């Protein structure tokens, strides 16, 4: 029996690793599945664990008020030392580009335990964009014994870095496995759908605003209103870039009074402060009240994964600086405009599901306007094939680990 330890600490990692935990757990005669979480994103991590019904075997609980990257790295590294000595896994699986993943991979390397890197080979080739994620994934990739690349391009990136071809398996992205699991769960449970609708109302947005004659329509053109879903929290955008993003969103909300703009606000004060500077009077609004003359700009509380997918499924398009959403939203047929200057997911650019708009005010306004005004342009993006997989990435990873 192989001992497989999966280590993660943030909400995006948890979403992408949760279906893999489930996949290994289906073979108790072959694998002892060990889950270690670091708590790098404490509250949001716990929400995902609850959704997928995962109870960690180890919880480092590293989150402290005001900690920086030095603190996170050192706490994960020291915490993993004792966990690895006790559990003695045969392989440690980490995900992507977080500080948790890099520190956990380094800890495993120090004990000469093989590391499997899920979502390996993504590159922007600029170590400061995104920061620190680009360097994190490059370091983790150097440590990894096994590389699970989501696409042929990410495999090519690794080969160009002289990574052994035998160590690389193209699997698709596990985020699509998670997305399909959640969408099926929501669609198959009317009570859950009603509960998520209530959760959104409590967070500050009433999805009935999108209905026609009291009925929810899946066709954007049949709705009385359309929805632009917004997320933004990247460190490299803090400062002038983030102010430009916020100003563009404000101007779009004023330009399109018949479109709702919904922004679940990240807990980070570096995100909330500039939003309150650009959207004057925001702090005076009551729950569920939209900002602006048309009352169509909604800043709501952060959403757990189920609620976010529920809202994303109802959206017309997504405006984001997130990495994972570039993979998820096209799986639901939603065009994505990325408020970053680079992306480690060029496959989406090539496929036409994603477009870079940076943090430039005019470019953001122009591209959102084009998607809202030009039906043919919208259809070209929304109907493009998602390059990130078929929902069977976890199965491929499990089969690889079985065979080693």
Label each PLM-derived region with a short phrase.
Residues 1-263, 270-404:
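Nucleotide-activated sugar donor-binding and catalytic core shared by glycosyltransferases
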């Amino acid at each position: 029996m192989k001992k497989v330890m999966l280590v993660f600490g943030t909400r995006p990692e948890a979403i992408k690793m949760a279906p893999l935990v489930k996949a290994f757990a289906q073979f108790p005669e072959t694998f002892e599945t060990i889950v270690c979480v670091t708590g790098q994103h404490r509250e949001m991590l716990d929400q995902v664990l609850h959704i997928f019904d995962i109870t960690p075997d180890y919880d480092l609980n590293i989150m402290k008020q005001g900690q920086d990257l030095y603190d996170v790295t050192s706490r994960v590294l020291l915490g993993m030392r004792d966990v690895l000595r006790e559990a003695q896994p045969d392989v440690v699986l980490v995900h992507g580009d977080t500080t948790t993943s890099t520190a956990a991979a380094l800890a495993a390397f120090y004990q000469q335990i093989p590391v499997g890197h899920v979502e390996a080979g993504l590159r922007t080739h600029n170590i400061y964009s995104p920061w620190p994620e680009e360097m994190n994934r490059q370091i983790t990739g150097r440590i990894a014994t096994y590389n699970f690349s989501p696409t042929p391009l990410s495999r090519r990136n690794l080969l160009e870095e002289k990574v052994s071809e035998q160590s690389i398996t193209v699997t698709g992205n596990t985020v699509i496995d998670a997305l399909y699991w959640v969408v099926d769960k929501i669609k198959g449970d009317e009570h859950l759908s009603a509960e998520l609708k209530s959760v959104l109302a409590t967070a500050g947005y009433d999805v009935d605003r999108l209905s026609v004659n009291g009925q929810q329509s899946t066709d954007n053109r049949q709705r009385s209103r359309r929805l632009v879903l917004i997320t933004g929290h990247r460190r490299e955008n803090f400062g002038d870039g983030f102010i430009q993003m916020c100003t563009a969103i404000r101007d779009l909300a004023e330009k399109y009074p018949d479109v709702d703009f919904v922004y679940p606000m990240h807990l980070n004060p570096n995100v909330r402060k500039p939003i309150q500077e650009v959207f004057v009077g925001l702090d005076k609004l009551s729950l569920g009240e939209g900002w602006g003359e048309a009352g169509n700009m909604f800043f709501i509380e952060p959403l757990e994964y189920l609620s976010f997918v529920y809202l994303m499924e109802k959206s017309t398009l997504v405006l984001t600086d997130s990495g994972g959403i570039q993979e998820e939203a096209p799986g639901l047929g939603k065009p994505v405009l990325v408020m970053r200057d680079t992306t480690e997911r060029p496959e989406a650019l090539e496929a036409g599901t994603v477009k870079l708009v940076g943090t430039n005010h005019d470019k953001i306004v122009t591209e959102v306007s084009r998607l809202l005004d030009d039906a043919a342009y919208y259809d070209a993006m929304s109907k493009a094939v998602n390059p990130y997989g078929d929902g069977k990435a976890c199965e491929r990873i499990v089969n690889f680990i079985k065979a080693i």
